[in-house]
Amino acid sequence: MAPKKTNGFMIFVNEWRKGRNISIAQAVSHCGDIWKNMSAQQKGPYNGFAKDANVSARAKVEPLDCHGRPLSAVERENCEAAEREMNMKRNIERIVLEGKAQHDLENTKFIFAAFNYFTKAIGNDIYMPAEFAACKFSLRSGRGPVYSSHINPGQLIFGQASDAQHHTSTTHQLPLPPKAMGESNMGSLYVNIVKYLRDCQGAGNPLVVFTTAELMPVVSGCFRYLQSDSDEVGEQIHVYDILYLFYVLKKEVMDIADLPHANINKCITDNFFFNDFFEYYSNIACQFHEDNDRGKYCTHSMVSRWCYTFCDYMCGDLAIKPLAGKHMPPVQEQKFCVTNPDKSMCGNTSYNSVSSWHSDVKQEPDSDYTPEDHSVFSANLTATEEFPSLSGRRPKPTHRHPPPQKGAWNVPAAKRSARDFDDAFNMTR
């Protein structure tokens, strides 16, 4: 049943009842004569209020999601996010295709960047940075010099000490503020980072850095945190997905090399990237993380490993000779040493080496031991004594023991008789 509409008379009745201890029925009977004697001009405001109330009642209440947000706002945010992602992919494809059109794709420069953070502010996407690293990369030159810095933001966000301690202890293990290491002037650090990015990108080009999808909100939030303490109006820094760059660049590299690439899809390239074959290499992280065995979480190590992964997957297609420290990690130093046995234990004993294809036996001159070469099989396959477990088994006995006698209780019920039961209870002495 549709709800009753509000009319001007009831608006007048409710207004007249205010301050009077009277029921609605009494008010209606009393106000009826007054309403009849009122002019159209006097009734106009009450009729207008009633019309507005009816319009508001007919308006639908917007549905909400489980977090109490209007669905229209959620859909609008999703559309904006999808549009941003589409624009990002188009820009990545444009950068790669421009290098391919100039026949200089192997020299196209990309900047990889990563941030470590202490904690994240509640209610927004601001992250408190702890460490930053960035490097310039190209397939021909490999990894360029790495710009890295530890960051000391001064004080943690109020109420976030526990979260910061938990996150830090499970990842990079950098000391918490105010005992943090590194640069403490956020404005100066931001200016230096922008200057470094501008020198790498060149004048007139937008500032674009590449990082993983997981670190994209972290990198954007840390840049906003640093920019908030800078007095200068900084340029906008675009943060793009390195995984999509990895996929597009691989496709174009194989196309240039005239290699079949129809079976290359983003799942394959993502899987290769996430394998992170250089994760446990040493001497590619900062000194702090090398000493504390946390190179996996070091930003210096992250950007270096990304460069090595790109080179490992694509340089072979373009016949680019890999160089240690550029296209692959530097030569690993041995962390162990091999020492000879104590000469005092050996004395002046000399040994004659007796070598064979699979063995290397040493014999002392004064010993009666004669080395034998056991690497050659010389047994006679027809001799039973050579294989006692197979052909030298004991013969099976020919006689069999008689089966044990069964009592009346072991005889099936259909074959039992009364005599069987009588014999079963007879006990021999």
Curated annotation (Swiss-Prot):
| GO MF terms, alphabetically ordered | transcription cis-regulatory region binding
Checking InterPro entries in the record gives: HMG_box_dom_sf (IPR036910), Maelstrom (IPR024970), Protein_maelstrom (IPR039259)
Write out the entry's keywords from A to Z: Cytoplasm, Developmental protein, Differentiation, DNA-binding, Meiosis, Nucleus, Oogenesis, Repressor, RNA-mediated gene silencing, Transcription, Transcription regulation
Name the DNA-binding segment ranges. 2-65
Subcellular localization(s) per the UniProt record: Cytoplasm; Nucleus
Which cellular component, as a GO term, is one annotated location?
P granule
Asked if the record carries the keyword Repressor, the reply is yes
Comp. bias regions, Basic residues: 393-403
Q: Where is this region: Disordered?
A: 383-429
Q: State where it is primarily located.
A: cytoplasm
Entry annotated with the keyword Repressor? yes
> What name does UniProt use for this protein?
Protein maelstrom
**What is the species of this protein?**
Drosophila grimshawi (Hawaiian fruit fly)
This protein's gene is called: mael
